[in-house]
């Protein structure tokens, strides 16, 4: 069995450490415990110094594999010296016959001769058939020394017979022994295991092993997140990570019987260029992994936000216009992960060909390898190979480069998967995608047909992207392939986000999203130009990573690409407008007061037509849905629907104060009718409690629930009451609070929710005509079981009641319960405050932007109240680590804030809070605000707060 072929004397002076061991043995010959302590100290010193040197060399040369080999070699020397010392000095087994000696072997990753700084050390101690009495005590002594050195040691003590027997039954053990490497002890014993394992386990079991390893890989990808474009990837286990490369090597070693990955070139499995790609990918991933372990001081495998910036710096990345150093580093990472995917595909193609040559029937072992070949109607260039599109001849692409697009189109219309050999040939033919092909009318027709397919366009586009065809055919798309945005909001790379957005659009059109998006599902069939909509969805983030605003830059890109796709001038203008305005509807819905007519008027002026409004709504839904899991919720859907309906009324000529009054009166009549089982006078009195915004924005079934809640509280004589309800579909929980109104009520409720660890996703805040507040706070669900979530919500409601009643003080509760989020500490968001009197006819609009943290909303609102500002409505939107809070305010007499000096003071106080500076307003946060004579928050009687966290 192979040992390290290279030594690294700069890491450890082996002779010097051996001499020190000899000195320890002679100095403590009769005292085992002092001997053990001295030995431990010597090894600890050598290990620390060796690893420090390995880290220093990694920083100097950036060689990831070399670093892993240095640490593995260091580990080998320590184990060898320890083995020799224990057998010779502790157990006096130096003269034991060869037949009774043990062998120490490395397995797992350590067996490959590479070891990450924080990785486990996996050892297999081989015993002879007839073991010596000292064997197991000696192994135990060695293990205790290794544990005391701080190593995490995975170990097994077995005979060769045990190894063979267990390998037959357990694929994990079989894989470990496949990588078994001799470290020290009996060479004969280790060699015998290698020979018997090869003859008795490996021979004639290749298909079984391959099937198991590929199934294991698929399951690993599922657990780690089945995309290589998650922005916090697992470098070891994730898709496109080191384990995928290891899987290729395991299969190579098992099936092709190679000792080194370089042998795959000799066998024709990989070309010389592809092998260089393999080496570069492995070296880069090892460099990243070693830096991660050194930086964190542990076996950290997830490349999380809080270490990405430091890893980028360690690897020597620098800022470029439009892309920060960390974003450039992560783009490189995802491109490497994509290369690993390409290599996997090429490898599987060669593997299938080899199996077909060796034993035609064996290809059934891997489920997708089938041999039936049929003609495909309408083409002579491609065939159906067991449900997968394959090439009819090797020169298909060279003869006609348009076939590089046509293959994907034919696969789409015939519902075919892709033969790995076909994709391998695509990868090797990318140079055929020239400027001439990009302008080819037929090629662009085929592409547009793929994009707007009524089947599953995302699947075909994804295959095109994985094969690098999409980025070559549309170079502007190629620039955003594997590009990540360094923030907590976007879960995927830009190209992955765009493909997912197309998928959402396709699902809406195919009627698969009616429950989640009823309005868009209703509007989609009536869209006049679906081609323009699909193109806009694909291109909406095409200009990310550029110095200028990506919406404006993206519109320029769209204006260039649309004529190339053979879109008409009218279609081009539609796409350009949609790309430029793709963030507008979301921002207006989430950060503006939708009950303020000027909000609707200003938005309608930008939209100008009902058709544009419909298309922008659908694009907005696709964009938010494709950001990542948990970003979309029912509250966002409600906001977008409200904005859509109000704007639709205005654009169709039906929006007026009179129409709003008529709609509010109709809503009041509906509520009174729904309360038919109440006495007439009581229900009429109740309906008069509510103002116009409440009646227009709260659903009737919610109004009925509120009525029962308020009636019950009044009957019980309760000044303060809370009610909770969970929503499975929207994944939110409602906490409704009935309380005497107070200018700082929002501060208290937000603070109590933050202290309870509840992530606010929205709020509906209304004031009744008798001076009470009826506030419904929406928080993210924490538990999937309704009973558990209801108990949690009740505890949050109880905390709100405790603070409002004065039983607990808000500053104390927040200080004791809130903690900063570790992940958000990796980011910086420059505090910004914008104060405008142009966005509303009645209110001054204050927009604050900064780094989100627990309790920020309560602190900001406390400062606004401290500055004698009345908050009419608040709109809290969080994009990952960044929060954008918008407040519609007046002074205490209901006027706008027009004084420049006062505006400057407001901005300064808010910036200080956003920056985390201590503000005296926090110490004066109110508690026990329930009073016999409440002070109302605003004269207009109703407010709406919107938040996403």
UniProtKB/Swiss-Prot annotation:
Q: Which domain of life is it from?
A: Bacteria
* Matching Gene3D superfamilies: 3.30.70.260, Beta Polymerase, domain 2 (3.30.460.10), cca-adding enzyme, domain 2 (1.10.3090.10)
Domain ACT per the UniProt entry, residue ranges: 734-815, 845-926
Keyword presence, Nucleotidyltransferase: yes
Record's Pfam families? ACT, GlnD_UR_UTase, HD, NTP_transf_2
Gene Ontology MF terms in the entry: [protein-PII] uridylyltransferase activity; phosphoric diester hydrolase activity
Q: Which HAMAP family does its entry note? A: PII_uridylyl_transf (MF_00277)
Protein name, UniProt field: Bifunctional uridylyltransferase/uridylyl-removing enzyme
Under PROSITE patterns, the record lists: ACT (PS51671), HD (PS51831)
Source species: Sinorhizobium medicae (strain WSM419)
PANTHER family associated with the record: BIFUNCTIONAL URIDYLYLTRANSFERASE/URIDYLYL-REMOVING ENZYME, BIFUNCTIONAL URIDYLYLTRANSFERASE_URIDYLYL-REMOVING ENZYME
Give the span(s) annotated as Uridylyl-removing. Answer: 378-733
Q: What's in the domain note?
A: Has four distinct domains: an N-terminal nucleotidyltransferase (NT) domain responsible for UTase activity, a central HD domain that encodes UR activity, and two C-terminal ACT domains that seem to have a role in glutamine sensing.
Which InterPro entries does the annotation name? ACT-like_dom_sf, ACT_dom, HD/PDEase_dom, HD_domain, NT_sf, PII_UdlTrfase/GS_AdlTrfase, Polymerase_NTP_transf_dom, UTase/UR
User: Which intervals of the chain are annotated as region Disordered?
Assistant: 925-949
Catalytic activity of the protein: [protein-PII]-L-tyrosine + UTP = [protein-PII]-uridylyl-L-tyrosine + diphosphate; [protein-PII]-uridylyl-L-tyrosine + H2O = [protein-PII]-L-tyrosine + UMP + H(+)
Activity regulation, per record: Uridylyltransferase (UTase) activity is inhibited by glutamine, while glutamine activates uridylyl-removing (UR) activity.
Domain HD, which positions? 494-610
List its EC numbers: 2.7.7.59, 3.1.4.-
Coiled-coil region(s): none
One GO biological process from the UniProt record? regulation of nitrogen utilization
Show the segment(s) annotated as Uridylyltransferase: 1-377
Sorted alphabetically, the keyword list is: Hydrolase, Magnesium, Multifunctional enzyme, Nitrogen fixation, Nucleotidyltransferase, Repeat, Transferase
Required cofactor(s): Mg(2+)
């Amino acid at each position: 069995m192979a040992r390290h072929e290279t030594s690294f004397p700069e890491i450890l002076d082996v002779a010097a450490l051996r001499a020190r061991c000899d000195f320890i043995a002679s100095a403590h010959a009769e005292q085992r415990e002092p001997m053990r302590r001295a030995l431990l100290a010597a090894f600890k010193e050598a290990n620390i110094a060796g690893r420090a040197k390995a880290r220093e060399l990694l920083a100097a040369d950036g060689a990831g594999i070399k670093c892993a080999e240095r640490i593995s070699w260091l580990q080998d020397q320590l184990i060898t010296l320890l083995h020799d010392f224990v057998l010779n000095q502790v157990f006096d087994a130096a003269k034991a016959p060869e037949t009774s000696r043990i062998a120490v072997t490395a397995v797992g990753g350590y067996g490959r001769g590479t070891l990450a700084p924080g990785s486990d050390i996996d050892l297999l101690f081989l015993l002879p058939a007839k073991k010596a009495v000292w064997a197991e005590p000696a192994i135990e002594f060695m293990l205790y020394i290794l544990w005391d050195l701080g190593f995490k040691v995975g170990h097994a003590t077995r005979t060769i017979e045990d190894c063979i027997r267990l390998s037959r039954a357990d694929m994990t053990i079989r894989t470990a022994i496949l990588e078994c490497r001799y470290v020290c002890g009996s060479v004969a014993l280790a060699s015998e295991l290698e020979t018997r394992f090869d003859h008795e386990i490996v021979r004639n079991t290749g298909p079984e092993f391959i099937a198991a390893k590929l199934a294991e890989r698929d399951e690993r990808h599922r657990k780690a997140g089945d995309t290589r474009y998650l922005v916090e990837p697992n470098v070891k286990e994730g898709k496109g990570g080191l384990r995928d490369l290891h899987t290729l090597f395991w299969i190579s070693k098992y099936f092709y019987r190679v000792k080194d990955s370089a042998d795959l070139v000799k066998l024709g499995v990989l070309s010389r260029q592809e092998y260089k790609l393999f080496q570069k990918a492995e070296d880069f991933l090892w460099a990243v992994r070693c830096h991660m372990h050194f930086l964190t001081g542990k076996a950290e495998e997830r490349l999380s936000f809080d270490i990405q910036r430091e890893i980028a710096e360690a690897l020597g990345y620098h800022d470029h216009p439009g892309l920060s150093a960390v974003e450039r580093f992560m783009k490189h990472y995802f491109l490497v992960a994509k290369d690993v995917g390409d290599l996997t595909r090429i490898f599987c193609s060669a593997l299938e060909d080899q199996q077909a040559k060796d034993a035609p029937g064996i290809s059934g072992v891997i489920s997708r390898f089938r041999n039936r070949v049929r003609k495909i109607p309408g083409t002579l260039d491609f065939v159906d190979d067991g449900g997968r599109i394959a090439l009819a001849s090797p020169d298909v692409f060279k003869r006609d480069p348009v076939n590089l697009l046509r293959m994907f189109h034919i696969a789409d219309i015939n519902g075919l998967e892709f033969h790995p050999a076909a994709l391998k040939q695509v990868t090797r033919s990318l140079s055929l995608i020239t400027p001439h092909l990009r302008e080819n009318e037929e090629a662009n027709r085929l592409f547009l047909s793929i994009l707007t397919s009524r089947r599953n366009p995302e699947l075909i586009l994804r295959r095109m992207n994985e094969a690098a065809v999409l980025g070559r055919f549309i170079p502007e798309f190629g620039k955003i392939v594997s590009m990540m945005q360094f923030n907590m909001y976007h879960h995927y790379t830009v190209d992955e986000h765009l493909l997912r957005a197309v998928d959402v659009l396709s699902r809406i059109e195919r009627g698969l999203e009616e429950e989640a998006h009823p309005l868009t599902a209703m509007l989609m069939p009536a869209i006049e130009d679906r081609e323009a909509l699909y193109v806009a969805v694909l291109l909406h983030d095409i200009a990310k990573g550029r110095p200028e605003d990506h919406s404006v830059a993206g519109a320029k890109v769209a204006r260039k690409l649309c004529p190339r796709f053979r879109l008409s001038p009218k279609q081009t203008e539609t796409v350009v407008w949609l790309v430029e305005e793709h963030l507008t509807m979301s921002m207006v819905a989430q950060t503006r007061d939708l009950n303020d007519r000027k909000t609707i008027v200003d938005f309608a002026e930008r939209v100008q037509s009902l058709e544009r409004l419909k298309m922008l709504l659908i694009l907005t839904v696709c964009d938010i849905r494709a950001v990542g899991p948990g970003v979309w919720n029912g509250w966002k859907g409600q906001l977008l629907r409200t904005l859509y309906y109000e704007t639709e009324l205005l654009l169709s000529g039906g929006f007026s104060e009179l129409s709003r009054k008529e709609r509010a009166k109709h809503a009041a009549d509906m509520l009174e009718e729904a309360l038919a089982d109440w006495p007439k006078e009581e229900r009429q009195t109740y309906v008069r409690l509510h103002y116009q915004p409440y009646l227009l924005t709260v659903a009737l079934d919610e109004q009925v629930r509120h009525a029962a809640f308020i009636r019950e509280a009044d009957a019980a004589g309760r000044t303060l009451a809370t009610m909770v309800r969970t929503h499975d579909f929207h994944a939110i929980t409602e906490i409704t609070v009935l309380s005497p109104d107070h200018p700082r009520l929002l501060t208290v409720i937000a603070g109590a929710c933050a202290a309870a660890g509840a992530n606010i996703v929205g709020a509906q805040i209304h004031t009744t005509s008798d001076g009470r507040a009826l506030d419904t706070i929406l928080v993210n669900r924490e538990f999937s079981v309704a009973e558990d979530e209801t108990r949690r919500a009740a505890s949050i409601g109880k905390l709100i009641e405790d603070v409002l009643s004065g039983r607990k003080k808000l500053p104390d509760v927040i200080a004791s319960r809130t903690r900063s989020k570790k992940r958000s500490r990796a980011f910086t968001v420059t505090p910004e405050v914008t104060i405008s009197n142009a966005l509303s006819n009645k209110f001054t609009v204050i927009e604050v932007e900064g780094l989100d943290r627990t309790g920020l909303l309560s602190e900001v609102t406390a400062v606004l109240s401290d500055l004698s500002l009345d908050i009419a409505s608040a709109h809290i939107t969080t994009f990952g680590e960044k929060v954008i809070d918008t407040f519609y305010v007046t002074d205490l007499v209901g006027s706008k804030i027009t004084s420049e000096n006062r505006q400057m003071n407001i901005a300064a106080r808010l910036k200080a809070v956003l920056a985390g500076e201590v503000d005296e307003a926090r110490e004066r946060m109110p508690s026990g605000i329930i009073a016999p004579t409440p002070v109302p928050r605003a004269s207009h009687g109703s407010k709406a707060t919107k938040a996403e966290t």
